[in-house]
Design a protein with these regions (language model features):
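Short glycine/proline- and aromatic-enriched beta-strand/turn motifs that initiate or cap beta-hairpins
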Residues: 30-79, 83, 170, 174, ...
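Compositionally biased, intrinsically disordered low-complexity segments enriched
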Residues: 6-8, 18, 35, 44-46, ...
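Gram-negative (and chloroplast) outer-membrane scaffold detector with strong preference
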Residues: 60-151
Length: 181
């Protein structure tokens, strides 16, 4: 058997400690979860620039990890309107994404929070524009019932994977409704 060098020894010990820590944290995470599901439907877009106007119809299916923390899987049906050098064009895309959000302020009638997200059309053949997006959004949920309207404002960066369209960053607004199960 080969003798480990000092660095290899430290790496193996660190791995062992991380695995042990992970195994100890699993019960804490499992029993501290709120364990409810959530659905969100929203429309988001921007009309601030004449050169680029993206609009997305979003459907999120998620899980409330705690009262404040949630994770969502997102599907978007997106259309982007372009006007470059006087030529108008559009691109239609289907996007799959993941969001992670945190509610900062809880009250009976209002929740205020923030979420970050990433999405990609994963090189789908039926998408005109191939891109990844990164977004950050502040939102408010209003009302006391299970179905709550949501209003949001955020920033999104489109990382284009084609030569036909360039990378873009926009400020967007969203409106929709959410259901907590």
């Amino acid at each position: 058997m080969r003798k480990l060098s000092y660095v290899e020894f430290l790496v193996s010990k660190t791995r062992q400690r991380l695995v042990l820590l992970f195994l100890l944290l699993i019960p804490i995470a499992a029993f501290s979860q709120k364990g409810t599901f959530r659905t969100l439907m929203q429309i988001q877009g921007t009309g601030l620039t004449k050169e680029f106007k993206p609009y997305e119809l979003c459907c999120d299916l998620g899980y409330n990890i705690t009262d404040n923390l949630y994770a969502d899987l997102r599907y978007e049906n997106a259309i982007a309107l372009f006007k470059e050098n006087g030529v108008k064009d559009y691109a239609h895309s289907h996007i799959v994404g993941l969001n992670l959000g945190y509610v900062v302020y809880h009250s009976e009638n209002c929740n205020i929070g923030a979420q970050i997200g990433y999405g990609s059309n994963m090189k789908r053949k039926n998408s005109d524009w191939k891109y990844d997006y990164y977004e950050a959004m502040a939102f408010t949920d209003l009302g006391t019932c299970k179905i709550k309207p949501r209003f949001g404002l955020g920033v999104r960066h489109y990382n284009s994977r084609t030569n036909h369209y360039k990378d873009r960053t926009v400020i967007f607004a969203s409106i929709g409704f959410g259901i907590n199960w």
